[in-house]
């Protein structure tokens, strides 16, 4: 892989969506010496269990570059928070508020797991939630360091690295995650902070954020893992409970 020994820079929490960008960001972070744990916001049955299986398979790939060929994957049960957002937040701000909630959860989990930063696959201007104004409004909920290895990469470069590390074919499987399954037609590209804060007041989000953190399930993935969630249940929480039996 080259770069620095994994772990020499400390540990980071990778927000892994299942798309092209976040696994590449995880690979590049490891190349810079950051040991990675992954978190995934699963929203079954609003999303299919196959979308979470895709994430398991992506972790298998990037765990090959990890410190001990083993990587923690934290499955966050996001549906309980996802539904109130869809029900109460104006369409144009759904993604903004959803991402703010995700950052809150990621920060709490990162602190719980002794991580020094959050890592994600954001690339400036690539989608509505990744304009500078969006990043400013979303990032406001945390003072935790955010590492964005792909911040100034274009899609061609990202795709090239995904091919190189073997994640491309997995990432393009046609299963939507919680950020894309109910994507509004006209998401705000320059969301205002004061408006986002006002909209959040319609949700009892603090209790729901804590619930998501407390009910997160952790599994450990290696390059040789043969875990197939779809054989264990229709929802991720059910599948992980059955995995213990």
Feature annotation, model-predicted:
Residues 1-15, 23-79, 140, 188-193, ...:
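RNA-binding accessory domains that recognize and position tRNA/RNA substrates
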Residues 1-6, 88-160, 164-165, 217, ...:
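Active-site adenylate/phosphate-handling loop in enzymes that bind or generate adenylated species
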Residues 19:
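Conserved G/P- and acidic residue-centered "switch" motifs that form tight phosphate/ATP-binding loops
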Residues 39-41, 76-79, 120-121, 149, ...:
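Generic beta-strand/beta-sheet core signal
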Residues 60-68, 108-116, 163-167, 186-187:
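Generic secondary-structure signature for well-ordered alpha-helical cores
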Residues 65-73, 115-116, 121, 175:
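Flexible, glycine/charged-enriched surface loops at secondary-structure junctions
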Residues 124-126, 174-182:
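Small/polar glycine-rich anion-binding or flexible loop at a beta-alpha turn
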Residues 166-174:
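A short alpha-helix-loop-beta-strand transition element characteristic
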